[in-house]
């Protein structure tokens, strides 16, 4: 995760640095076994079964995916019958998403917009969507869950739903090498600085990715939930999971497709969580 402190962050805009890193990951991720774009295209896969079980039938609904990266998950919902819009601050990711939509044959019901989350309502329109979808690894990259919640509430029609699945903030407080607490669970104004090389999708892609740092902010569960309640959302369910979808720590053990857990012999803690909320 992070290496503590922020070093020379005063001379670096964290969001600019993050955008630079995400732009550089796009070709690596599109080609990676982790994302398996070729298999996804060939097999016509839709959304993950566990996510579809929570959201149910999305046929004919308007769905927006915030921080969509290169759009693979977004387009899975298009294959399930939704009209989708993906938003991401990486122009390289948006270009790749538009190309993937064409290759998947769903470009007629998929729109992709390059913009930061804080501009979502202004650019996409208020009360336009039935579903806001946010998937793993999103909350960390924005300093304010309050601003994000305002965008979520503004994008949804009355009765519209937020689906959020993300890394559990407790797991983000763990040391990279063991199960000790190394970082704060609660939000702080100063971001963490992460100077690791490679990527979660391809840790060996050292030469293809810059060694420049990225920056992130941890957000406790209560902070995230309260921000949503404050903008008129109703919390429908909150589930904590003892698994996560990627091997973000070297000591995790793979037990199934996109499922990694703490090894036997250690106490279990939540590694990810799922939240469903409704705009009232």
Describe the predicted segments one by one.
Residues 1-37:
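N-terminal, positively charged/glycine-rich alpha-helical extensions of SAM-dependent methyltransferases
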Residues 33-62:
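Conserved alpha-helix/loop element of class I SAM-dependent methyltransferases that forms part
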Residues 61-121:
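Class I SAM-dependent methyltransferase SAM/SAH-binding core
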Residues 118, 122-132:
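A short acidic, Gly/Pro-enriched loop at the edge of an enzyme's catalytic core
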Residues 130-146:
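A short SAM/SAH-binding and catalytic strip from SAM-dependent methyltransferases
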Residues 146-161:
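A short glycine-rich, Lys/Arg-flanked "PGG" loop and its adjoining helix->strand segment in the class I
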Residues 161-203:
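Conserved class I S-adenosyl-L-methionine
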Residues 214-238:
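Short alpha-helix
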């Amino acid at each position: 995760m992070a290496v503590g402190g922020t070093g020379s962050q005063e001379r670096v805009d964290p969001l600019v640095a993050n955008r630079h890193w995400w732009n550089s990951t796009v070709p690596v991720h599109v080609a990676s076994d982790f994302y398996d774009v070729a298999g996804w295209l060939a097999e016509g896969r839709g959304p993950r079964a566990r996510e579809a079980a929570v959201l149910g039938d999305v046929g004919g609904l308007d769905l927006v995916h915030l921080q969509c990266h290169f759009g693979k998950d977004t387009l899975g919902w298009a294959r399930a019958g939704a009209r989708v819009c993906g938003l991401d601050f990486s122009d390289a990711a948006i270009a790749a998403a538009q190309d993937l939509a064409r290759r998947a044959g769903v470009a007629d019901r998929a729109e992709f917009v390059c913009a930061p989350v804080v501009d979502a309502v202004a650019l996409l329109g208020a009360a336009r969507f039935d579903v806001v979808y946010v998937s793993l690894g999103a909350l960390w990259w924005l300093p304010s869950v309050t601003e994000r919640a305002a965008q979520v509430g503004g994008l949804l029609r009355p009765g519209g739903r937020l689906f959020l699945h993300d890394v559990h903030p407790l797991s983000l407080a763990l040391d990279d090498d063991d199960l000790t607490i190394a970082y704060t669970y609660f939000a702080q104004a100063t971001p963490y600085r992460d100077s690791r090389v490679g990527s979660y999708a391809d840790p060996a892609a050292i030469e293809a990715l810059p060694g420049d740092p990225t920056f992130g902010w941890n957000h406790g569960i209560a902070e995230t939930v309260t921000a949503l309640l404050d903008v008129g959302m109703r919390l429908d369910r909150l589930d904590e999971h003892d698994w996560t979808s990627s091997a973000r720590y070297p000591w995790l053990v793979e037990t199934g497709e996109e499922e990694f857990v703490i090894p036997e012999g250690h106490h279990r803690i939540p590694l990810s969580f799922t939240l469903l909320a409704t705009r009232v």
